[in-house]
């Protein structure tokens, strides 16, 4: 074990070490996990008092493990002779709004270039397919954090995003082969077998899928607006089809070097293979550390948690055009909150029925006004159109025609 604070080696002061990292919402791909590291030090002489939170901590668990870098983002409430510090890797800093200044449409490569300049982190492009980098993007939401954007991009080629080195992040695709083999499980709960046979994306009126339902379905995050082409779903399926492992809980084992969520581990010469979605490493001295693993993935079509930043002014833009047989959908939505300027429009025609949706904002008291909050509701009205395309000027009713 090697631990350095700046250039100061504090390894001999270590009393307790706990590293934890997990995937959100039990999802297999599209994750941007941040490693949380909690360490307790002997601070008898106050050498760690008033730490500089701008400095990186360098951690290397053993000679065979990668060197990882962490920062303390908040000063301890108080400094004591036994000092506990909580720190995170660079992915933690990605929870900031993607305040893009690009003129849309752009490509994903353009967005990654801008994210590099906004975060100061280098995005390693090795392994990102060219069709992903070249994909055109015509939408943005500047209240959604950069971490979500990177996760959505990673999902396009069955990858996750990890911090690497002192100032980089890397996209790492899921592999169907085991990352490591071990015989050192001291406890485990083995559950059902997961076999991927289908990939499915909701995508509004036009669901996209590849494969069949003989096994398990990988559901693409329904909030991922990048995942809008059949070719993307085909590519994810081709990469992951046949992926098989046992879901597990409460695995206790001797730690495996450089293991992170997203990897497969083979136990006892192919007795079974399990997926790592949640990992905790504890070290209290001695020759090795111990790990606790959970390996569950979702089998339901559930929305991924989207983290937003609350700004005084929010700007959202969305443009969607879709044509599926007789269905025609054109959506143009813009909204600015905090400056009293709003616009929303939705037009849908299917044969002779048109749907008009208008947005109504109601102020709910002085407290809400001060918080610049609002309550929104949608009123749906129907009318018969003579040509099935042009919405009529009159005859609108909240009752659907029979």
Language-model-detected regions and their locations in the chain:
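Acidic, low-complexity/disordered segments
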Residues: 1-7, 79-87, 101, 170-224, ...
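Assembly/oligomerization scaffold segments
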Residues: 1-102, 140, 152-158, 165, ...
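A broad structural signal for short, well-ordered beta-strand segments within beta-sheet-rich domains
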Residues: 11-23, 132-140, 185-189, 276, ...
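Short amphipathic alpha-helical segments
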Residues: 13, 107, 111, 145, ...
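Alpha-helix C-terminal capping segments
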Residues: 59-61, 115-116, 262-269
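Charged- and aromatic-enriched interaction segments used to assemble
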Residues: 76-194, 217, 226
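C-terminal, beta-rich DNA-binding module of retroviral/retroelements integrases
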Residues: 224-248
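Surface-exposed receptor/substrate recognition regions of extracellular proteins
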Residues: 272-275, 323-402
């Amino acid at each position: 074990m090697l631990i350095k604070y700046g250039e100061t080696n504090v390894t001999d002061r270590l009393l307790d070490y706990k590293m934890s990292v997990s995937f959100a919402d039990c999802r297999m791909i599209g994750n941007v996990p941040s490693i949380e590291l909690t360490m307790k030090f002997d601070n008898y002489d106050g050498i760690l008092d008033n730490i500089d939170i701008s400095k990186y901590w360098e951690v290397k668990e053993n000679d065979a493990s990668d060197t990882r870098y962490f920062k303390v983002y908040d000063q301890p409430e108080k400094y004591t002779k036994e000092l506990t510090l909580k720190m995170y890797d660079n992915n933690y800093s990605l929870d900031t709004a993607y305040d893009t200044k690009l003129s849309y449409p752009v490509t994903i490569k353009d967005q990654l270039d801008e994210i590099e300049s906004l975060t100061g982190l280098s995005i390693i492009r090795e392994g990102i397919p060219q069709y992903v980098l070249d994909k055109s993007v015509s939408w943005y939401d500047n209240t959604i954090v950069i971490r979500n954007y990177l996760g959505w991009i990673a999902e396009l080629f069955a990858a996750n995003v990890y911090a690497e080195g002192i100032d980089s992040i890397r996209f790492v695709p899921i592999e169907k082969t085991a990352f490591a083999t071990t015989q050192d499980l001291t406890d485990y709960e083995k559950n059902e077998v997961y076999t991927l046979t289908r990939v499915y994306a909701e995508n509004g009126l036009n669901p996209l899928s590849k494969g069949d339902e003989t096994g398990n379905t990988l559901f693409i995050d329904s909030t991922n607006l990048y995942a809008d082409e059949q070719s993307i779903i085909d590519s994810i399926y081709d990469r992951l089809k046949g992926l098989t492992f046992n879901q597990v809980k409460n695995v206790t084992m001797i730690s495996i070097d450089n293991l992170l969520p997203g990897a497969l581990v083979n136990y006892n010469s192919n007795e079974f293979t399990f997926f790592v979605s949640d990992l905790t490493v504890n070290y209290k001295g001695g020759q090795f550390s111990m790990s606790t693993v959970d390996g569950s993935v979702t089998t339901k079509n559930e929305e991924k948690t989207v983290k937003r930043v609350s700004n005084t002014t929010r700007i959202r833009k969305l443009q969607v055009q879709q044509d599926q047989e007789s269905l025609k959908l054109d959506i143009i939505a813009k909204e600015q909150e905090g400056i009293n300027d709003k616009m929303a429009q939705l037009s849908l025609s299917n044969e002779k029925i048109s749907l008009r949706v208008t947005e109504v904002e109601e102020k709910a008291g002085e407290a809400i006004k001060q918080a610049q909050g609002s309550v929104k509701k949608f009123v749906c009205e129907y009318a018969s159109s003579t040509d099935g395309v042009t919405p009529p000027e009159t005859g609108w009713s909240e009752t659907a025609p029979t």
